Regions:
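Sec-dependent signal peptide recognition
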Residues: 1-7
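Hydrophobic h-region of N-terminal signal peptides that target proteins for export
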Residues: 8-17
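Sequence signature of WD/YWTD-type beta-propeller architectures
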Residues: 18-384
């Protein structure tokens, strides 16, 4: 009997190894991260994991404001549900990415940005002491890696002033350095910039550092000036540029922004449409036999075997306007939809909140937002 049980376990392990989607195909537990009701709870974006590097806490933004514009940056202890407020009265650009809150320094710190009287600043909080440090003004924050000390920043996309380059703050040294200049982008891709942005001054926007810390990708913005950031036409934002820190050079450019994200090997970018770009050659491939969901924000599991995305679910049998969370094999062919839900309620932000799903570091959980009721809620799906 013991032999039969052991054999069954080995076969199950082999099945999951051959088919990484299998573990997500049944008995997946889905629940809100927090049991507290009567407020929005929002994970920021699909390029950053809200779970702390040690897996003990979850980071999110909460708000009772109808549109989610003002609230608190909090962490929740997964084992007990206890919440700690890291920052309060935080004013945001929208409920789409909230405060861009993210882990830093192996979980010792949390970074976010906020606006006070129309002046933006980047803030870092020491999780143990709750001490806050303003590391930059007239800047917003991009996305670094939770296990290291580097935090990318950029000038406000609608009116960057003199801050048009990519800057990186190092929590170890407390120093900020310029790591990529918009002038380098202009020198290499000037013809594209002139065509896309009609000759308007441009700046680096929304940088995301690669897992190996050797590269960064970013979008380009041409601001319309002023201080009205709550508007779609505050700036024109488009394109994708990949920059190599070691070479101090732009190495790749794509004319459209398609919700890109790094793959774990730092050699590829995966984006909506199930497209995988090789950053060295610019060539791309698509996942075979995996339905494409419209409006998706895809991200890849830490082991590189799976992708998760959100999107409208009609291509997979969903009702019109229903959204869902889809997991798929990065080799193509196998996929599963974990959750169908409405996404037309929640925070009444001028830029709507999207689910923005992302895996935990161990690949066993997926975090995402839903807006199927009065409040936007951060959910977690956990496989057996």
């Amino acid at each position: 009997m013991k032999f039969v049980f052991t054999l069954a376990c080995l076969l199950a392990v082999r099945c999951f190894a051959d088919d990484p989607v299998a573990a997500w195909s049944k008995d997946v537990r889905i629940k809100p991260v927090s049991s507290v009701e009567g407020r929005h709870s929002i994970h920021t974006y699909y390029v950053t994991n809200p779970e702390s590097p040690d897996g003990k806490h979850v980071l999110f933004f909460t708000s009772t404001h109808p549109a989610g514009y003002v609230g608190e940056v909090r962490i929740l202890e997964r084992a007990t549900g206890k919440e700690t407020v890291l920052a309060e009265n935080v004013h945001t650009e929208d409920a789409h990415r909230a405060a861009c809150q993210q882990w830093l320094s192996g979980g010792k710190r949390v970074a976010f940005h906020e606006v006070i009287d129309k002046k933006w600043r980047v803030v870092v909080v020491d999780v143990a002491t709750l001490e806050k440090k303003i590391v930059a003004e007239d800047h917003q924050v991009g996305f670094g890696r939770p296990d290291v000390d580097l935090l990318p920043m950029y000038g406000c996309h609608w009116n960057p002033g003199p801050f048009r380059d990519l800057e990186v703050w190092d929590s170890k040294t407390g120093q900020t350095t310029t790591r990529a200049k918009i002038a380098e982008v202009e020198a290499k891709y000037g013809e594209w910039l002139a065509k896309e942005f009609a000759g308007k001054p441009c700046s680096v926007f929304f940088p995301v550092i690669s897992p190996d810390l050797k590269r960064v990708f970013f979008k380009i913005a041409a601001g319309n000036g002023g201080d009205d950031f709550m508007a779609k036409n505050a700036s024109h934002r488009q394109g994708l540029v990949c920059y190599d820190f070691e070479k101090s050079a732009c190495i790749w450019q794509h004319g459209k922004w398609g919700h890109p994200g790094w793959t774990p090997d730092s050699q590829h970018i995966f984006e909506m449409g199930n497209v995988i770009f090789d950053i060295h050659t610019g060539k791309y491939t698509k996942l075979k036999d995996v339905p494409v969901l419209r409006g998706s924000h895809p991200s890849v599991s830490p082991d590189g075997k799976l992708m998760v995305t959100d999107g409208l679910t009609e291509p997979v049998g969903g009702r019109p306007n229903d959204w869902g969370i889809q997991v798929a094999d990065m080799h193509g062919g196998k996929w599963a939809v974990l959750h169908h839900f409405e996404q037309n309620r929640g925070a009444r932000s001028w830029r709507r909140n999207d689910p923005h799903p992302v895996f935990s570091a161990d690949g066993k959980r997926i975090y995402y937002n839903t807006s199927d009721s009065q409040f936007t809620r951060l959910m977690v799906a956990e496989r057996p």
